Amino acid sequence: MLVELSIKQFAIIEQLTVSFDKGLTVLTGETGAGKSIIIDAIGLLLGGRGSAEYVRYGEKRAEIEGLFILEPKHPAFAKAEALGIQADDGMIVLRRDVTNQGKSICRINGKLVTLGILREIGQSLVDIHGQHEHQTLLHKEQHLSLLDHFAGPPLETVLDEYKELYKQYLALERQLAQLTENEKEMAQKTDLFQYQLKEIEAANLEPGEDKRLEAERLKLANAEKLFKSVHDAYNNLYGEGRGLEWINNALTHIEDASSYDPELGKLQQHVQEQYYLLEEAMFTLRDYLDKLEFDPTRLEMIESRLHELQKLKRKYGDSVDAIVEYASTIEEQLDSILHKDDRIKQLEQSLETMRLDLEVESAALTNIRKQIAMELTESIHEQLRALYMEKTSFEVKFHETAEGKKPFRENGVDDVEFYLSTNPGEPVKPLAKVASGGEISRIMLALKTIFSNHQGVTSVIFDEVDTGVSGRVAQAIAEKIRHISVGSQVLCISHLPQVAAMADTHLYISKKEVGGRVTTEVRALKDEEKVEEIARMIAGVEMTELTKEHAKELLDLATSIKCNH
C-alpha cells in the first residue's frame, strides 16, 4: 500500500507530505483546495503524462515521491528484480521529477529508470479510477487474467499443467525450425562442420596434452640452468666439509652429551631423523642428475606440436580439452543435419502428439472458464443491482476465430473480453467502448468490488466517482467503496457525505496564502471535526444543528455497517 506521499513545487503545492493508512481514506475540502492536484501528483508518479505546466510558477522542478510497503510475493518485486532494482524490507520507493523544461527524471529505489519502466511498476501498485490511462479493468488484455484470478484453485492446476506442456511444445517447435531452415544454409553448415572435424581429428588430440607439453618444454628449454641448480644443491649436501658431514659431526657430539644428560636423547633422535631425510634428498638429487639430459630434437618436436595446437586454439577453444568438447558438439550437430529427415519426422510426430494433448488441456481450460464466466456474470449483476443498475447487462465473451481453430498461447487458446449494455434492448458492446457517460462510475465500481482482490494492485484511487448521484445511490456507492477497502487500500476524493462517513481516515484539504502565494495543506480530522465537515458537505455554507445531527446519523450508520461486515 501507499504509506507516504511527498509533493514539492507541484501546481499550487509548495511542499506537502501525507501519510496514508490501510482501509478507506477519504479526501474532502472546498473546490479548488487541491484535492485533485494530489491525485494528479500520484498519477504522475505512476508514469502519467508529464508537463512543464505542473511545475509551480517560478520553480525549477516539481518533485513527487511515494513509499509503498508490499507483501513479499507482490508481482512488483519480481518486475523490479528482473530490472536489477533492489527492493529491501518489502519497500518500493517511486520518485519522479519534472523540470520547468518538461523533462522527466524517474527513479525506483534510487535507481534511474525510463518512464516506461516507472509506468509498468506503478500500474502494478495502484489503480486510479478517474484517469483513463490507469483504468486497467478497461484493458481487454487484462480480462482473461482477471477471469482466471476469479476462478482461483479450480483453474490453477489445469492451467499449470497446460503451461508446462506448452513450454515443451515451444521447445520442440524451435528444434524443428532449426532443422528445416533453408537448404543453402544447411549445406554451408555441413561443409564447415566436416572441414572443422577433419582438421581436429587429423591433429590426434589427447586430453590435457597442451599442459603436459608446456611443462616438458619449460624443462628442456632450461636444461642447463636446471642441471647447475640441482648439481650445486647436491654438492652442498655431499662431500667433505659439506652439509651432511656437518650434521653427522653434530649428531656425534649430541650423542656424547646425552650420556651425561638423558634429556638430550630426544634432540639426538630429532637430528638423526633430519640427517636421514637430507641423505634421502641427496640420493634423489644424484638420481635426478644421472637421468637429466638435453635433447634438442625433442624440444624442437614439442615446439612444433605446441605451434600446431595454438593454431587450433585460435579457431576452436582456449585449451585442448575445449577443442575436444567443441568437436563433440559439432559432430552431434553434423549427425543431426545428415540425418535431419529422420529427426524432422520424429519431431513432427512428437509435435502432433503434443498438439493433441494441448487441445485436450486447452479444452478443459475453456470449459472451466466458461463455467466461471457464468458465476462472474451473476456476481457482477448482483453488484449492479445493489447500485440500482438492474437493467444493465454484463457478459463475458469468448471470441472465435474465422477459421474456427485458435492458436495455442501461454494461457490457453481463449480470447476473452468483457461486454456491457446499459440500456434494455441494446446489444452488449466491449467494456472499453461503453466506458463513457455518467453511469460508468457505478459500472466500474461494481467491477472493482468483484476484482479488487484479483488485480494484484494494493491501492485503489477513486477521483470523484460519485459525481451526480445522491440518496440511496450515494449510500450504495459508499458501501461498495467501503467493501473494496477491506481487501485493498482505497483513497477517495468525494463530495458525498455518505462516502466521507465511511472513512477510516478523513483528510481535509485546504488552501492558505503564505507570502502572497496560495499553497495547499492537508490534515487528518478528529471525531468532532468529522461531524463538522460532513455537515458542511450536507448543507453547504449554512450549517444547522439539524445538519449536524444528520452528519452524526451518517457516521453512526457507517459504524454499524463496518461492524456488521
From Swiss-Prot:
Pfam families according to UniProt: SMC_N
Superkingdom, taxonomy of origin: Bacteria
Disulfide-bond pairs as recorded: none
Gene3D superfamilies assigned: P-loop containing nucleotide triphosphate hydrolases (3.40.50.300)
GO CC term, one of those recorded: bacterial nucleoid
ATP-binding found in the keyword field: yes
Any GO molecular function: ATP binding
Record's keyword terms, sorted: ATP-binding, DNA damage, DNA repair, Nucleotide-binding
GO BP of this protein: DNA recombination; DNA repair; SOS response
Residues annotated to bind ATP: G29, E30, T31, G32, A33, G34, K35, S36
Family under the similarity heading: Belongs to the RecN family.
Function description: May be involved in recombinational repair of damaged DNA.
Matches recorded under PANTHER family: DNA REPAIR PROTEIN RECN (PTHR11059:SF0)
Listed name of the protein: DNA repair protein RecN
